Amino acid sequence: EELVDFARRLLIKRQARLEAQRRPTVSVVAPAMAETASAHEFCVPGGAFVSGQHAWARIEPGGQVRIGLDDFARKALGLFDRVSLPAHGTQVRAGDPLFTVGRGDGMVRFPSPVSGRVVASNETLVGEPDRASRSPYDRGWFCLLQPSDLAAELPALRIGKPVIAWYQEEIARLRAAA
């Protein structure tokens, strides 16, 4: 029994060491696939644009833009326990604070990736902030905007393979700082 306990402890230590050495992967996925990704997988939302401040923006069929928090930010922040959303009708410009997430005493503001008027907020997140962590590109969206200058602002956002390269740079930067 003592030998089994000793072997189990060694195995746990080895597993932890291997996990720490494992290099994260980055891939483009369908929105629902991000829900099943491991901690070492960073998911880029297929068909969505990503801002340099880690908000994604997806153009909906009616021309509105759905906005949320990207997988990189949600994994860097961990689980958060509160969300603050803009009021319906709020006018924002690209770069203005749009939504806030918090954990404990800390709060992080995320700027809007595009300019426009808030036409809806995902109020479910106020009562269930972890939904944004569980389903970042599907049910965990934060706001829906009616864009005002989308054609001019889209070139500042990344989509597809450029997001993968940027995530890899961000991961390397984060690991170097650790």
Indicate where each model-derived feature is located:
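A structural signal for short beta-strand/turn segments enriched in small hydrophobics and glycine
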Residues: 86-104, 116, 145
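Conserved strand-loop elements at the edges of beta-sheets that form or border functional pockets
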Residues: 59, 103, 112
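Histidine- and aromatic-rich ligand-binding microenvironments
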Residues: 109-115
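Non-catalytic terminal segments and appended small domains
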Residues: 1-82, 88, 108, 121-178
